[in-house]
């Protein structure tokens, strides 16, 4: 792969909206990605392998639970800082950002928000350093966009819970030390359980033959009469709203992350267009290529403003689920279109591993699907503005 020469576009001087801390956090993540991710990620994607050696580096830049209070091992940063870290990591690779998103928003977040003090003290510091890695079990083979229909269940056996069922499309599953598992009790109420690797009956087979997120480990969670200690139930919240609150945090991070992928594709296409000579001049001097580049930077700028405003609302505790959903849908859609246009601008070179664009393009096909599909997010917006659910 070619050297990482990335220069971030900032057409509307958005840096002026950021604090010094925001810029320090972002720049640290950006330099780490250039140094540790860019040189190796294409090789790991080609091999369909997650680069475990970067886990410590991810922890060092604050990618694991940056908004978690310092008393639990987090950095105590705000939501804009979290978004900027996700942006920079996804600029490197969506699969690596997925690993970070899951650890932060889908594992550490529910333990912090819904767990007991004992659970927070036991798990959060080790998750923050990457000593423990986690995964999040919600999606099932027959229940994707309809998680309320889940069949994974647990029974009260007196001194423990007995957990049965299966989850699929689970990022980090093959190597996770703990899993946040959402299951129904005997009354049909959804609760979150912390399931540890090594518990008899708990297995995590890996999912192979992916064309997308190849540098991210994906698997299943299988529960065959798993005995879960009662102290591993998170008591702070139950019902579908609990995992949905986690997904709000993850979707927010994705809204920022997608900008990173788009910026990388735009920057690559712009540099290539200035250097590639056809018909005795750079292709950047043609109307068609300028149109593409102008549209790219316009859409990136709009997405940056949307994410920044959403970050302000998150910091103020005012952001709604529907607002987060809109940003996730819009920004991922923006990124996938930019990736496709950038790929065309590079011609045949665009499909090679010398450039990051094709990898981004394939990865974004997953990003536009997970944490709520593209169409489901439209229905969330539709329900919010009309007051009428169209899910059934």
Residues of each region from the PLM?
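Alpha-helical interface subdomain recognition
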Residues: 1-102, 114-119, 126-131, 146-147, ...
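Short Ser/Thr-interspersed hydrophobic loop/turn segments at strand-loop and sheet-helix junctions
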Residues: 62, 86-90, 183-185, 195-200, ...
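Short Gly/Pro-enriched turn/cap motifs at secondary-structure boundaries
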Residues: 127, 142-145, 169-172, 184, ...
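A short, Trp-centered hydrophobic/proline-enriched beta-strand micro-motif
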Residues: 130-138
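A short core secondary-structure module
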Residues: 159-160, 164-204
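Long, acidic (Asp/Glu-rich), low-complexity accessory segments flanking structured domains
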Residues: 224-242
